[in-house]
Amino acid sequence: MKTLEILSPVECDRLMSWCYQQELNHEIFTGQLTCRKQRWWGFEAEFYFNRSHVYERPPIESDAYLSSLRDRYQPEANSILLYRYEVGGTIGEHLDKQCFEEMVTLINLVDDLPNLFGQRPTTRFRWGRQNYELEHGQVIAFNSRVLHSVPKLKSPRYSLQFRRIAQ
């Protein structure tokens, strides 16, 4: 796992405002409702047990701001996923599905009030059996074929993920 950047407070505010404007749908994974809401651009991968289906969604280029973030952090990405987790949300240890290429770029956004020092709570992210505390606005790149998880959240969170569908 590698930190690419930590967004400035102004950039975080702009991205949070953008997230609030997105229409999110409840995620269904292997036929079950999950703790997350989602929205896809480019290509969506839907999973049902050992099968995956890839669907076209609105083009990434249909949103100039989103397209600029893709070009900045993972220009080859053809699939972007926005997740919202509520307090208590979690995702167990897993490897991402084979329909994706290995590398993922993720922007972590914490939807909670800052403390007196202007800092928001961190998000625990477990990757490769090590715990990391992701800051609000932290941009990371990681290999999704290494076990990773998000333990039970203490604050709501957005996760904006850039990926490439494997050819």
Where are these regions (language model features)?
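Non-heme Fe(II) oxygenase metal-center motifs and adjacent flexible, charged/small-residue loops
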Residues: 1-167
